[in-house]
């Protein structure tokens, strides 16, 4: 069972916390991690690309010249694909790129990402994280006391407006609640700070 240090907001270690082996201590599955990341990135694509085919381009209803007798190749429309300004053949059309993975696969990917962070000493657990007012300098002080100076993902048990507002002006810092934790965010950030209550919620869902 993985055991990590427990810190307070001033950066002092106040104890240790045991993490669920089935969530934070598994052997990471890189193939499943890859599948989950690709799925998430695909779901984020807009898919609004569009071009006009020959039926959608304005004009071209009249035959440009008669069928026979001109010596030129026969043409039926000035909007045929071979004409300048004509329609596009097999061009992109609006579509949804998103797809789904099985629930077991998604959960395994999330466990793999969390276990990787623990194994690399990139996961910090806070006793609690709350501010009386949404002050950026307070969040900066917390990160500084924990010696976090790179991209960091902060996971709280539930949405806290003061914490969210205090961190939004800090580059490379993102706040999610325990229900919104995902593989892409975990992989994209160098450090992950999780509150003790958030750990309990994550273990409740994934264990």
From Swiss-Prot:
Which Pfam families does the entry link to? Ribosomal_L4
Q: Where is the composition biased (Basic and acidic residues)?
A: 47-59
A GO CC term? Answer: ribonucleoprotein complex
Q: Which UniProt keywords apply?
A: Ribonucleoprotein, Ribosomal protein, RNA-binding, rRNA-binding
Region ranges (Disordered): 44-78
Molecular function via GO: rRNA binding; structural constituent of ribosome
List the Gene3D superfamilies hit by this protein, alphabetically. Answer: 3.40.1370.10
Q: Where is the composition biased (Basic residues)?
A: 60-71
Q: Which GO terms describe its biological process?
A: translation
Described purpose of this protein according to its UniProt entry? One of the primary rRNA binding proteins, this protein initially binds near the 5'-end of the 23S rRNA. It is important during the early stages of 50S assembly. It makes multiple contacts with different domains of the 23S rRNA in the assembled 50S subunit and ribosome. Forms part of the polypeptide exit tunnel.
Annotated family: Belongs to the universal ribosomal protein uL4 family.
Q: How does it assemble?
A: Part of the 50S ribosomal subunit.
Q: What is this protein called?
A: Large ribosomal subunit protein uL4
Point out the gene that encodes the protein.
rplD
């Amino acid at each position: 069972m993985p055991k990590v240090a427990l810190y307070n907001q001033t950066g002092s270690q106040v104890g240790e916390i045991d993490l669920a082996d089935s969530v934070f201590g598994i052997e990471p599955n890189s193939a499943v991690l890859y599948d989950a990341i690709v799925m998430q990135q695909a779901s984020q694509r807009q898919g609004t690309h569009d071009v006009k085919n020959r039926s959608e381009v304005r004009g071209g209803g009249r035959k440009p010249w008669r069928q026979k007798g001109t010596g030129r190749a026969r043409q039926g429309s000035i909007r045929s694909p071979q004409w300048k300004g004509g329609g596009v053949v097999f061009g992109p059309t609006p579509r949804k790129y998103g797809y789904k993975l099985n629930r077991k696969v998604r959960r395994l990917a999330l466990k793999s990402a969390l276990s990787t962070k623990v194994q690399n000493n990139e996961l910090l657990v806070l006793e609690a994280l709350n501010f009386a007012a949404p002050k950026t300098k307070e969040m900066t002080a917390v990160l500084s006391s924990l010696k976090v100076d790179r991209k960091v993902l902060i996971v709280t048990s539930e949405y806290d407006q003061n914490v969210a507002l205090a961190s939004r002006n800090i580059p490379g810092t993102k706040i999610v609640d325990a229900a919104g934790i995902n593989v892409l965010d975990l992989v994209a950030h160098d450090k992950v700070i999780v509150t003790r209550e958030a750990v309990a919620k994550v273990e409740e869902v994934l264990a």
